Amino acid sequence: MKKQPIGFMDSGVGGLTLVKEARKRLPNEDMVFIGDQARLPYGEKPAATVREFAWQMANFLRHQEIKALVIACNTATAAALPDLQAQLAIPVIGVIKPGSIAALQTTHNRRVGVIATTGTIQSAAYSQQMAALNPDVQVTGLAAPQFVTMIEANQRHGQAVQTIVNQILQPLQKSEIDTLVLGCTHFPLLTTAIQTAVGPDVTLVNPAVQAITMLEEVLTQQQQLATTTPGTLRMYTTGSVAAFEEIAQQWLAQPDLTAQQVDIQKEKNDGPDR
């Protein structure tokens, strides 16, 4: 039987934070990643536009014969998860429910902060998901779209970066949160600066960990977990290959990683599976 890959999609390089976790936990799985860098940031775009772009990425990955799809983007999860789950005949996993579950398992005072893109914060997806799981939780959301721009420019370290992060997260100082969800898959690449800004008493939650746990559970239930040969990784971007490869090689600690540029708008669209 042919070994089918897992598909990962994001607006840019942020989704590699899930790929990194998946490669650590599921080393025998083949993976395909698409980052739509040519059209980021998604967080400032209307939900309808994000849904259109998300379908184009999913359609591209569908032609790679994937067995499961991970929407490695909070903005796209908030806007397009129900649609993609209805349209595709494979498991589709987002990051907001996993992030919410992890936050509720972490918090002691039921005060949770969420930093994300403008689109994710305005959708109230995290506060609604957490309220559905625990009505007693108090969620404080803060849009931090500047972080995406910084990370895509590979500006992740140094005092200048720390100063900007401190300024952006300053509104959380009086919120009394004890848990902070990194509600954009780019944000774990700024973990050190974010932790410094909020202090040691606030626990950071990376939804990638719980999302890959859910992925592993789904593949196990469907008896599709790869267990034999080591997995491979193919990476595609709609933007600059050089910029993508620089961050991917650093974040995944593999200096030989390469990516290909693709135009997903030209990909043949056969319509939904169902």
Swiss-Prot record:
<keyword id="KW-0961">Cell wall biogenesis/degradation</keyword>
<dbReference type="Pfam" id="PF01177">
    <property type="entry name" value="Asp_Glu_race"/>
</dbReference>
<dbReference type="GO" id="GO:0008881">
    <property type="term" value="F:glutamate racemase activity"/>
</dbReference>
<dbReference type="InterPro" id="IPR001920">
    <property type="entry name" value="Asp/Glu_race"/>
</dbReference>
<dbReference type="InterPro" id="IPR004391">
    <property type="entry name" value="Glu_race"/>
</dbReference>
<feature type="active site" description="Proton donor/acceptor">
    <location>
        <position position="184"/>
    </location>
</feature>
<keyword id="KW-0413">Isomerase</keyword>
<dbReference type="GO" id="GO:0071555">
    <property type="term" value="P:cell wall organization"/>
</dbReference>
<comment type="similarity">
    <text>Belongs to the aspartate/glutamate racemases family.</text>
</comment>
<feature type="binding site">
    <location>
        <begin position="185"/>
        <end position="186"/>
    </location>
    <ligand>
        <name>substrate</name>
    </ligand>
</feature>
<comment type="function">
    <text>Provides the (R)-glutamate required for cell wall biosynthesis.</text>
</comment>
<feature type="binding site">
    <location>
        <begin position="10"/>
        <end position="11"/>
    </location>
    <ligand>
        <name>substrate</name>
    </ligand>
</feature>
<feature type="binding site">
    <location>
        <begin position="74"/>
        <end position="75"/>
    </location>
    <ligand>
        <name>substrate</name>
    </ligand>
</feature>
<protein>
    <recommendedName>
        <fullName>Glutamate racemase</fullName>
        <ecNumber>5.1.1.3</ecNumber>
    </recommendedName>
</protein>
<keyword id="KW-0573">Peptidoglycan synthesis</keyword>
<feature type="active site" description="Proton donor/acceptor">
    <location>
        <position position="73"/>
    </location>
</feature>
<dbReference type="GO" id="GO:0009252">
    <property type="term" value="P:peptidoglycan biosynthetic process"/>
</dbReference>
<dbReference type="InterPro" id="IPR015942">
    <property type="entry name" value="Asp/Glu/hydantoin_racemase"/>
</dbReference>
<feature type="binding site">
    <location>
        <begin position="42"/>
        <end position="43"/>
    </location>
    <ligand>
        <name>substrate</name>
    </ligand>
</feature>
<dbReference type="InterPro" id="IPR033134">
    <property type="entry name" value="Asp/Glu_racemase_AS_2"/>
</dbReference>
<comment type="pathway">
    <text>Cell wall biogenesis; peptidoglycan biosynthesis.</text>
</comment>
<dbReference type="InterPro" id="IPR018187">
    <property type="entry name" value="Asp/Glu_racemase_AS_1"/>
</dbReference>
<dbReference type="GO" id="GO:0008360">
    <property type="term" value="P:regulation of cell shape"/>
</dbReference>
<keyword id="KW-0133">Cell shape</keyword>
